Amino acid sequence: MTHSMLRLTGWAALAAAAALVGCSKKEEAPGAAAPASAAAAASAPAAPLKIAFAYVGPVGDGGWTFAHDNARKALEKELGDKVTTSFTENVKEGPDAERVLRDMVGQGNKLIFGTTFGYMDYMLKVAADAKDVKFEHATGYKTSDNMHAYDSRTYEGAYMAGVIAGGMTKANVLGVVGSVPIPEVVRNINSFTLGAQSVNPKVRTKVVWINEWVNPPKEAEAAQSLLNGGADVLFQNTDSSAVLQTAEKAGKYAFGWDSDMTAYGPKAHLASSVINWTPYYVKTTKEVLDGTWKPSPTKIWWGVKEGAIDIVSISDKVPAELKDKLMKVKAGLKDGSFSIWKGPIVNNDGKEVLKKDEVADDKWLDAITFYVKGVEGKVPGGDKK
């Protein structure tokens, strides 16, 4: 019923009341319309929560951004008309990220996900000016009253891939294409190496950095240089499938990263370490919808235990015995009985960084700037422990 119809109804009631009992009842008739108006407002469906995602790469990268966008789609499917989502891809880490984030606020989004490390300071700045908006920043460490830092334990997937790599290499030389030398990526390289060493102590790991998250030509060039240097199994912490495709062409082995990349190199593919962001995105969105979202002074971590990290599409080339070892590791990560970063662990200078039975906490893991024993070279700008 429109407001004009309500007014007509009110005047009709007034006239009828006046005819029956006189002028003393004139003020009651307009009041009778108010409950109907309030009921109509109460029954109207709530507007959907507007959610925006800022992506560092294209949604078709087959890796990192692809995984985030799959989770966005799953979020829409699960929550239906309670939410409406949008995304902006290829948002570079730099001042332009702030512009994009401010645009998202201006468009009325009340929950914004920034999905790469380099957005951190820009998101923190925007969050300070938009207190009615909730912000979620992936892989960073800074937080505020309306901004979370969240991360997946990708190093668990890296370790599991390493178990396979250590058992499959013939040359005992592994190659890793690194993206940006921040603790997250260094941690993954080290965890991959530790996993390989758990089944083959002779392995050593070579690393080539491209200093970008996604650049397929550079990724392919780096992969080829590692193959030329003697590596026969490749791993990556970059966002496209170029490393796997390079291994496929060379008749060597490699892994998928962040998403299942089997289709890009079915002969080379040994397994894919994948991230499922959906559980976290659904949980966080529900908290915003029902008003239970709360600040967290520390980063929120999700891994194998929470269903965020897995290793999938394991090749038939991987022997059953090696698969059994892998499944035991996965089970231990799931129930908490196994810790990847448990001492003794030494860096590649021979310095003990974790004593026997000492287990690294999340703060320690988030500050790794060294290579473990078995990884060649030095971390660019690192090696502080």
Describe the residue ranges of each PLM region:
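Bacterial N-terminal signal peptides that target proteins for export
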Residues: 1-12
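Bacterial signal peptide processing site
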Residues: 23-27
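Extracytoplasmic "Venus flytrap"
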Residues: 44-46, 50-71, 75-79, 86-97, ...
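An alpha-beta-alpha
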Residues: 72, 159-203, 207, 297-319
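Periplasmic-binding protein-like
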Residues: 108-116, 136-138, 229-238, 257
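Flexible loop/hinge segments that line or gate small-molecule binding clefts
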Residues: 128-152, 259-267
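Hydrophobic alpha-helical segments within soluble ligand-binding/sensing domains
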Residues: 150-172, 274-293
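Segments of small-molecule ligand-sensing domains
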Residues: 290-385
